[in-house]
Amino acid sequence: MMTTEDFKKSTANLKKVVPLMMKHHVAATPVNYALWYTYVDQAIPQLNAEMDSVLKNFGLCPPASGEHLYQQYIATKAETNINQLRANVEVLLGEISSSMSDTLSDTSSFANVIDKSFKDLERVEQDNLSIEEVMTVIRRLVSDSKDIRHSTNFLNNQLNAATLEISRLKEQLAKVQKDALFDSLSGLYNRRAFDGDMFTLIHAGQQVSLIMLDIDHFKALNDNYGHLFGDQIIRAIAKRLQSLCRDGVTAYRYGGEEFALIAPHKSLRIARQFAESVRRSIEKLTVKDRRSGQSVGSITASFGVVEKIEGDSLESLIGRADGLLYEAKNLGRNRVMPL
């Protein structure tokens, strides 16, 4: 039960939350409100510490960071999984309902057979039925009882299978929310997270630079060593990017062999210097092929770096960065553009 003090506290928090969300360009959704109410309430110190770090690095709260903090500190496991679980369980329930309807229909038919059979048997003395006629009634009962037993067994098997399937879904759905933000192969934020964060930073009017990088000769590496080795390279580069990112620079897997780095509050000059340090670090990588045991070096990447300018949209900013990236490819790869 809410006390007068609780009410006063919640009202005071409300007055703080909404302006704070507006200040940091946070969309007014129930999830975001719950996150920021908890932040203002200072109910979870670790949440506040991580949020303060995000605000320091970005000057606002990017959508991916906010969603990640919400899932980590506020959302219950059931809430995280409920939407997909509901959809899958509805399918299972539909299948079970259909089986139950069939079984009930069979049961109703069997009841009619039993009634008719008993009536036929009551005529044994009245109509002097022959042994053969009596055996016909009994055979009909035996046959129909086998059918109903088969139908009931089928329903039981489906119920058991559904129970196992629901258990499996519960295990898998624990990853659903994470998968919505993270790339499963690299462990980095995914394209969806990138689009949301970059869009927010652009429209907040903040200084931000974008680094796009693409692994050189990736198709040839795949062809020569196989796709599993290609996956090893992607994971190795992702791990290297994570180790190098600091001061708010965040790494994303943009798609395929292409990655993106968002650098808030960084000028083109600083972002280019950082990209150059990343390029040098990647070219020192050696990845061991797990199948053959062979170590492969000479892994390089090409880079395109841009700083947001007045009038930039998400599409135009990415387009300029990609243009410079492919210029780096055309000039011989393993370089950062602009020079």
From Swiss-Prot:
Name of one Pfam family that matches: GGDEF
Gene Ontology, cellular component aspect: plasma membrane
Biological process according to GO: cell adhesion involved in single-species biofilm formation; negative regulation of bacterial-type flagellum-dependent cell motility
SUPFAM superfamilies noted in UniProt: Nucleotide cyclase
Textual note on the cofactor: Binds 1 Mg(2+) ion per subunit.
Sorted UniProt keywords: GTP-binding, Magnesium, Metal-binding, Nucleotide-binding, Transferase
Entry binding sites for substrate: 222, 231
Domain of life: Bacteria
Single GO MF annotation: metal ion binding
Active site: 257
Enzyme Commission code: 2.7.7.65
Identification of the protein by name: Diguanylate cyclase VdcA
Organism of this sequence: Vibrio cholerae serotype O1 (strain ATCC 39315 / El Tor Inaba N16961)
Lineage summary: Bacteria, Pseudomonadati, Pseudomonadota, Gammaproteobacteria, Vibrionales
